[in-house]
């Protein structure tokens, strides 16, 4: 059952309250490079990013906000550490959300200033706790950044905002340990109704990062926990978007094209791996709620993938196009991709 959380608005995007799970990413261009940041922001929106975050390390970086906002329609999140004045300036510049931990910005007067401005401008705040940011007192209590330590830290930061009647809060608790990550989100889901931003931190390069994120994020979503997500990868941020969307698709939480393909065997008589990769690339920007199959042989292909809306299956130098398990065309191997895309266009 889906955990129903409080709903907040990041710009024009709903987070929580039963809204569809959104996919986020973060700019990795230096904040001093405004032109490059704008270019990457536009590319990430095109790739399907729904909420975009940018590091705002100093006052000069605040200039990024209006420059990026002018070119994209998705909300921009200011990622801020320690300096409460940056949060105030980011709010004035029109961010859709601030990411800041109130316990790290000074005394009550500073927390109150940020809470007041964000409340007036209807800007939510994401509290972002990770295993490297847990307070020393909490670490001493638990001995390590355990799931309970992460949860306690997040609730501590939330209480600082609640003191000043600010409750438009999103919470994330990220660990590089998948097991700790999952347990932390399970605990926080039971102890508050704030929307949860899912992610596994410091997952590594593309291959291992995708594996850890799929398990850490996907297992929580499958149990109804989570309202928005970011897949953190040491890679092109566009890969974060693709992976996040794929996780949602695999769980049936978003529409769009689903690609299935067989693992190949000794009966395969075409370059199925090459064909499957080409089909995947061709489907990248197809906006249809369909399932497409790429199968290796005519013996099992149409039958095994009969639930697919469309598919291809290979033979010796040729292949079949099938629709809902029924063969509709036979074409030479070299024409399989084009023939498949023609049929997809007809749907």
Regions found by a protein language model. Give the residues of each.
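Hydrophobic or amphipathic alpha-helical targeting/insertion segments
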Residues: 85-126
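Glycine-rich phosphate-binding active-site loops on the catalytic face of alpha/beta enzymes
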Residues: 50, 94-108, 200, 223-237, ...
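Alpha-helix-loop-beta-strand connector modules within alpha/beta enzyme cores
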Residues: 59-80, 113-125, 185-196, 279-281
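N-terminal amphipathic alpha-helix/helix-capping segment at the start of soluble metabolic enzymes
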Residues: 1-26, 119, 281
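Hydrophobic faces of well-ordered beta-strands that scaffold small-molecule active sites
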Residues: 21-27, 52-54, 76-80, 98-100, ...
